[in-house]
Amino acid sequence: MEEGRDDEYCSFSNSGDRDGGLSGCFFLDHVGQVLLSRNHDGLSWKCLDSSDCEGTTCLGIIICENSETEIKFSDIYAVEFVSYGLVHSPKLGLRHAKECFRERLLNTQEMYRFTVHGFQSSPKEPCLWNLAAFTFGHMDLQTCQSWMDQLNYSLIKEVERPRNLLVFVHPKSGKGNGSKVWETVSKIFIRAKVNTKVIVTERAGHAFDVMASIQNKELHTYDGIIAVGGDGFFNEILNGYLLSRLKVPLPPSPSDSFNSVQSRGSSSVPEPGDEVHETDQKEHYPLLPDSVQEVMNFRTVNGSCEGIEDPDHPFSSERPRFGLIPAGSTDAIVMCTTGARDPVTSALHIILGRKLFLDAMQVVRWKTASTSTIEPYIRYAASFAGYGFYGDVISESEKYRWMGPKRYDYVGTKIFLKHRSYEAEVMFEEAESENSKASLHTRSKTWPFRNTTRSEKILCRANCKICNSKVGWNSASTTLNPCPEKTRWCRTKGRFLSIGAAVMSNRNERAPDGLVVDAHLSDGFLHLILIKDCSRPKYLWHLTELAKRGGEPLNFEFVEYHKTRAFTFTSFGEESVWNLDGEIFEAHQLSAQVLRGLIPLFASGPEI
């Protein structure tokens, strides 16, 4: 650095206010001299060295485009001082490095430096967030410190960001790399000055027990609860929190809904002109009590029902935000809420305080087996509940845990070859859109077992208008927003290869579009998928459509698909097994209902 050039590093402010504009000349590592500016929502910089930015030197290589570059405060997770050291000249391609080495070496200088840490979206995968660091150098230490103070002040104003987190790590999740995943991302939390209390689970149900027993006073000292594991581990933590706190009326039992059902034998969609049996909302819509105090059938920590509220674990309107760092076998929840199955991306969503709300499904088991007495038992699911094929796969997979995630492919093939079907009865509350959709189904002349109907699909994305249309969960009480005044229940009975209820699309590596491509994260609906008994080739075609991007897995005659807020299930076999977010759930009779926007989550939704 030559003497007499200190004026190039002067900083000047357009406003005395901390929120006002601020500009100054700095050297950006590997770029060159830039004019750095701070405005109300972020940083921007513009190259000042024409020899670097115009691309007229070093054989015409453009080192830095002559345009402004920026990063928003909402995308910055840390600013740190990195002491006195080298600020490098612009990066060069290998072909030209030798020719320009001597010239660029002269421009490499030592100065005081600070680094702005943020992220950049991958050009090919916008949902994938890559760590990015921008190091700025200046000859004056006080100037660097002043800029750091200003930037940190701006970050403090990002009020949604967590400062203290309770982290559960499942060391054996997925391929058994839960601890390694946390070790990788924990460095980002440390750099962002986020305090973490880490609990590495030692047994099944460990996280559930901690969440069920922790006092709300202690829970409120944390800004969020983080799971490092898979969907099943997230389910365990969620149930530990909700079962001891959430008090809402239960959904109708199968016998209750039968009294108000419009029965049509094996057809669950009424034809145009049919008489519609409507019921009053107070009778059959379970989530609209007359008052906050009018609740029924509460449950204890173990899921059984009682009528006594636990005073040590009331359900707070200020619910903790949950987060999930993927380390599981499928990681469908992360795929649906961030768009990427990437621990670093999920960690950044958490640190930067991204927020959305997820629907949750309350599942009530009335009977375990056909000979059991009626005894309500409650669980919650954040993504999926499945019976038949799905239940058989999760049940059989327990024998092959030593295989890791590959066990699902192996067991799935075995169950497919067995081609078992189950006799059952399903009743569901019909959504308003079902009435018009029912009259539109027509048969394809070329493929008699496929439907020709193609409806416009509105996919769930970041800042989704459908999910943000209204908040489903009333933060002032444990009630939901008003629902339609009248509801209609329909019944379908027969033999099924599988029955699935999806809360979200459930995208994963085996089903890139998910079970229902246009399912939303917080629209207040369950997506009921009934696969009726059919030949093995037809079922294989359905699974093939499910496994490819742009497929139509629901467009078959033997597939019934309904959007609903609640449904009931009764098996005609001796026993039945359900898959609840990847966990085994035995239920001969069950009911389920959606709770809109119940779960606050550190995520922003997929970008594309």
UniProtKB/Swiss-Prot annotation:
InterPro entries: ATP-NAD_kinase_N, Diacylglycerol_kinase_cat_dom, Lipid_Phosphate_FormReg, NAD/diacylglycerol_kinase_sf. One of its GO terms (biological process) is regulation of programmed cell death. Residues 254-280 are annotated as: Disordered. The keyword Transmembrane does not apply. ATP binds at residues 170-174, 201, 230-236, 329. Disruption phenotype: Enhanced apoptotic-like cell death late in development. It catalyses: an N-acylsphing-4-enine + ATP = an N-acylsphing-4-enine 1-phosphate + ADP + H(+). GO terms for molecular function: ATP binding; calcium ion binding; ceramide kinase activity. Induction: By infection with bacterial pathogen P.syringae. Gene3D superfamilies: 2.60.200.40, Probable inorganic polyphosphate/atp-NAD kinase, domain 1. This is Ceramide kinase.
